[in-house]
């Protein structure tokens, strides 16, 4: 079925309002019983895109704090590769937006400081919620229950990594001081046009997994605003965002996609891949045959001063 026809069908008001819910329930039941080899075919990808459009049209965006330590290992591997050539004892300016409970910023700092303990890493960790930021600042986590997060923060760590990152006391763990040191915690809104004045230019800006929870026009304005934080020639990590929107902004602002580990990073977080096409934050399968593959699926960009 041609993609354009599917797109027009998914936008039909009658289909959205009266048919979509039962239609999606039946399709989800059938989809989850298909062999992976069938789901990977082009006709099923196109049909999945049609289903995702329906899901997206019916979904209400909401703030979400669920995350994991070492959530996307290939992404962390690329961060390690980018900081490795830096001069001995040099300063690295890092800003992590929507840092949530701290899992991402601590994962990044553990990666950087394990590889380059000599670097002076000046870190800003930012979130819009003062409540979740307090959890992050404390760096103390329950192994049995987290009040704000439904899933286990530690499910992607092995025992060696748990020992390397945390000090344990019974049913709690605390992030090790050498990882935590020197972080500047700040309640702020990524949409604030004064953000660049507040934090200055950064060598690496991480803006992962929160733009998808905004309406698209709001997300686009926010992404353009975030780009102003990146030092010319620096790097922007941005995943968890509508792929068409990200590609549009990247082209408009002249970002250079980083090709290293492109597919590995795209597929590096199994939770969002598993959720496509049934959740609005789900991530479509990597398609190397697309002509725009290198920019559509890139989630790491070198940014220059066109923002």
Each PLM stretch: what is its role?
Residues 232-241:
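Conserved beta-strand signature within the Rossmann-like core of class I S-adenosyl-L-methionine
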Residues 122-200, 206, 210:
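Extended basic-aromatic, gly/pro-enriched interface segments that bind polyanionic ligands
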Residues 141-172, 248-298:
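Conserved Class I S-adenosyl-L-methionine
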Residues 212-214, 244:
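A short His-aromatic
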Residues 101-118:
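Conserved SAM-binding loop of SAM-dependent methyltransferases across substrates and taxa
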Residues 98-100, 127:
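Conserved S-adenosyl-L-methionine
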Residues 220-232:
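A short glycine-rich, Lys/Arg-flanked "PGG" loop and its adjoining helix->strand segment in the class I
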Residues 7-8, 12-95:
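Conserved AdoMet
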């Amino acid at each position: 079925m041609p993609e354009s026809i599917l797109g027009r069908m998914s936008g039909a008001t009658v289909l959205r309002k009266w048919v979509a819910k039962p239609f999606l329930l039946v399709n989800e039941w059938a989809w989850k019983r298909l062999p992976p080899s069938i789901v990977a075919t082009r006709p099923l990808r196109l049909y999945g895109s049609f289903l995702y459009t329906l899901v997206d049209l019916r979904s209400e965006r909401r703030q979400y704090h669920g995350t994991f330590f070492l959530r996307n290992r290939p992404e962390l591997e690329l961060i390690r590769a980018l900081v490795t050539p830096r001069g001995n004892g040099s300063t690295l300016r890092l800003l992590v937006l929507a840092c949530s409970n701290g899992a991402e910023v601590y994962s990044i700092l553990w990666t950087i400081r394990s590889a380059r303990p000599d670097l002076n890493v000046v870190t800003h960790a930012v979130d819009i919620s003062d409540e979740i930021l307090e959890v992050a600042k404390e760096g103390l986590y329950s192994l049995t229950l987290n009040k704000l997060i439904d899933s286990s923060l530690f499910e992607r760590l092995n025992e060696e990594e748990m020992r390397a990152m945390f000090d344990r006391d019974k049913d709690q763990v605390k992030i090790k001081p050498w990882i935590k040191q020197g972080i500047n915690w700040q309640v702020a809104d990524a949409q604030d046009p004064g953000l660049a004045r507040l934090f200055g230019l950064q060598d690496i800006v991480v803006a992962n997994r929160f733009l998808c929870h905004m309406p698209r026009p709001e997300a686009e304005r926010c992404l353009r605003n975030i780009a102003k934080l990146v030092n010319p020639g620096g790097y922007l990590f941005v995943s968890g965002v509508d792929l068409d929107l990200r590609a549009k902004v990247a082209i408009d602002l002249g970002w250079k996609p980083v090709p290293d580990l492109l597919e590995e990073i795209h597929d590096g977080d199994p939770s969002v891949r598993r959720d496509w096409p049934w959740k609005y934050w789900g991530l479509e399968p990597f398609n190397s045959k697309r002509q725009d593959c290198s920019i559509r699926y890139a989630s790491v960009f070198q940014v220059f001063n066109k923002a």
